[in-house]
């Protein structure tokens, strides 16, 4: 069995600023859809998948403002549900596996949602059917 052995004798002290992580950032950003109030999120890694999700939310009608590096303001008070049926939405959402994370907040706030079968990064076992099964157990139906 592998282990880390820490040999010290000195008290640890200091400050550590954690680096933003993509998968957590995608989930936290999607949570802005759970309120119509302004949400400010900091420590967001400005990497391709995160920027794609922010662009997708903008298309949905979420007002997004970059306040400074790694800090954004979101306001989801007017969701454009017509956009969810456009080719632009379909292609953007399908190219981002994390787009599945918009579905829960849309169902919770509006009682409906739409996402194409996501593509994107497929490293490891990350099944999407667990999301759908959970939604069905909460009363959602899928077409």
Q: What spans do the regions from the language model cover?
A:
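Structural preference for solvent-exposed beta-strand-turn elements
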Residues: 1-143
């Amino acid at each position: 069995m592998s282990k880390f052995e820490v040999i010290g004798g000195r008290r640890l002290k200091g400050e550590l600023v954690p680096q933003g992580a993509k998968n957590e950032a995608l989930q936290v950003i999607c949570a802005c859809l759970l309120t119509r109030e302004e949400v400010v999120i900091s420590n967001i890694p400005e990497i391709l998948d995160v920027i794609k999700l922010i662009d997708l939310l903008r298309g949905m009608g979420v007002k997004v403002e970059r306040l400074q590096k790694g800090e954004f303001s979101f306001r989801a008070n007017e969701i454009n549900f017509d956009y969810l049926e456009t080719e632009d939405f379909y292609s953007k959402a399908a190219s981002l596996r994390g787009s599945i994370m918009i579905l829960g907040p849309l169902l919770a706030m509006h009682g409906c949602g739409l996402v194409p079968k996501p593509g994107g990064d497929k490293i490891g076992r990350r099944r999407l059917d667990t999301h759908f099964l959970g939604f069905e157990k909460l009363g959602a139906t899928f077409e």
